């Protein structure tokens, strides 16, 4: 006997939209068919007449219970209980945040620490991207391989240190040689590489230039993280991806040039993807100074 049948709704699938029924056994969809396909009894039947039935959404980029400093205060983003509950009300059933491996910390410890934040505290399904920082030695590479084999199938890196050169603490940037080796591992084991892609030389040069000119107000951020930097860095990463065969997922794409680089690579059949943020879709740099923080 099936556990659940959903009938009467307009069902959205990867192959189209139709008036179909959905059969569920345990926690998995086991069938989608025309009305009357699943005539056997079910533990529960949901009448979705007049409704659109869609798969649960996946939030692929979230920073949950993540520390940050604002106006001199040590704060953190909302915890899993709060975020996962809100996500379910919006139809999102899976959340992915980041297990951060800082220099000197091994990957297994990073995963364990992040999992402890979520375990028993989430209403939704969850997992973590591995976020690597700085030098990636052979030990870290081996730990990444093991983590991928255990199901943590995505890794994020930065091609820039992002923050001003005066920021204390270790940097985030992964150098191109390590990126190449990581891409080979990613391709070999069927994982996905997420890249925060900017040209570090350009970013740091603009930080120094604006500092010298006493123009470090927040609305000049687009001058630091600019279109030229995104264009140069995306194409450099994509060139290495072409040599290694690695898939690439660019996070928070913000420039037309980045979109063009992704489109050109996809036209060649490369497994390249990009995501953006809603604020990039609603505002451009001309409106930054007028926006509300």
Model-derived regions, located:
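Metal-associated gating/positioning segment near the N- to mid-region
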Residues: 48-121
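Divalent metal-coordination and catalytic microenvironments
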Residues: 9, 22, 27, 50, ...
């Amino acid at each position: 006997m099936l556990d659940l049948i959903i009938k009467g709704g307009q069902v959205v699938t990867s192959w189209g939209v139709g008036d179909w029924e959905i059969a569920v056994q345990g926690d998995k969809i086991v069938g989608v068919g025309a009305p009357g396909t699943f005539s056997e009894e079910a533990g529960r039947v949901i009448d979705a007449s007049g409704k659109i039935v869609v798969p649960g959404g996946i939030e692929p980029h979230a920073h949950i219970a993540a520390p940050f400093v604002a106006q001199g205060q040590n704060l953190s983003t909302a915890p899993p209980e709060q975020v996962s509950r809100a996500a379910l009300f919006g139809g999102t059933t899976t959340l992915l945040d980041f297990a951060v491996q800082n220099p000197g910390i091994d990957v297994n410890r990073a995963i364990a620490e992040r999992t402890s934040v979520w375990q028993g505290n989430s209403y939704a399904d969850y997992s973590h991207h591995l976020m690597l920082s700085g030098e990636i030695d052979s030990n870290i590479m081996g730990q990444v391989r093991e983590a991928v084999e255990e199901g943590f199938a995505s890794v994020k890196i930065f091609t820039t240190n992002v923050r001003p050169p005066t920021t204390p603490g270790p940097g985030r940037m992964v150098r191109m040689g390590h990126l190449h080796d990581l891409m080979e591992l990613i391709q070999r084991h069927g994982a996905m590489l997420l890249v925060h892609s900017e040209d570090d030389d350009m970013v740091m040069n603009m930080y120094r230039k604006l500092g010298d000119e006493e123009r470090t107000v927040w609305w000049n951020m687009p001058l630091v993280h600019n279109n030229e930097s995104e264009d140069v860095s995306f194409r450099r990463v994509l060139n290495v991806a072409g040599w290694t065969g690695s898939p690439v997922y660019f996070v928070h794409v913000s420039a037309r040039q980045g979109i063009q680089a992704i489109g050109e690579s996809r036209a060649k059949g490369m497994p390249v993807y990009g995501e953006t943020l809603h604020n990039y879709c609603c505002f451009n740099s001309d409106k930054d100074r007028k926006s509300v923080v």
